[in-house]
Design a protein with these regions (language model features):
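Aliphatic-rich helix starts adjacent to a transmembrane/signal segment
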Residues: 2-71
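Short amphipathic alpha-helical segments
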Residues: 33, 77, 104, 172
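Type IV pilin-like appendage domain
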Residues: 83-146
Length: 187
């Protein structure tokens, strides 16, 4: 093939600057559309993950709290099942070893919110249970269903918990608020 030879009729034509600009503009439009779709998909995924995280965290905390509330007061009647009836803290008691004393590890369990971490202390210090807790509220009720602040009169407990993800989701606020009411079985 001779590179200096005259062009043949079936050779590709020349590309002008206008043709290049039109092609570049079309590529930019298609690229912008693809980027927009990918970005919206990423945002939807992040929102869904944040929602799932907050719901799972709240459910785990309420499940553990509910289970411990149901067995509070086990092992005797010489003590209150709820030791402290505070709106921001929950202190439960049970006699696990049957010695009549609330002294061994696990016999007095404290739940409290420290910063944005819900913590539990069963004798080994405050251990983190759930991160990202925005609010933790405890309401105590007597046998008639009236609110009470007397630990000995508590027969049921309502727990309200609101959680947020540990990270921020751009363009939205993800929060899960759950409430449950649990009756003490041993009182």
């Amino acid at each position: 093939m001779d590179i200096d030879a005259a062009s043949v009729a079936d050779d590709a034509g020349r590309v002008s600057l206008a043709d290049l600009l039109v092609g570049l503009a079309m590529f930019a439009v298609v690229g912008a559309a693809a980027f927009t779709l990918l970005d919206e998909g990423r945002r939807a995924w992040a929102f869904g993950m944040a929602r799932a995280e907050t719901q799972q965290s709240a459910r785990v905390a309420l499940a553990r709290l509910s289970a411990e509330l149901r067995v509070a007061g086990r092992g005797g009647r010489g003590f209150d099942a709820v030791a402290v009836a505070a709106p921001d803290m929950l202190v439960l008691q049970q006699d696990l070893d049957g010695d009549g004393l609330i002294a061994a590890n696990g016999e007095r369990v404290t739940w409290r919110l420290v910063g944005t971490v819900l913590r539990r202390d069963a004798g080994g210090g405050l251990q983190p249970i759930v991160n990202g807790v925005r609010s933790f509220r405890v309401t105590y009720f007597d046998a008639a269903g009236a609110p009470t602040a007397a630990p000995g009169a508590v027969r049921s407990v309502e727990i309200a918990l609101a959680t947020r993800p540990d990270y921020s989701v751009v363009g939205s606020t993800v929060e899960t608020a759950l409430t449950t009411r649990v009756r003490l079985r041993n009182r």
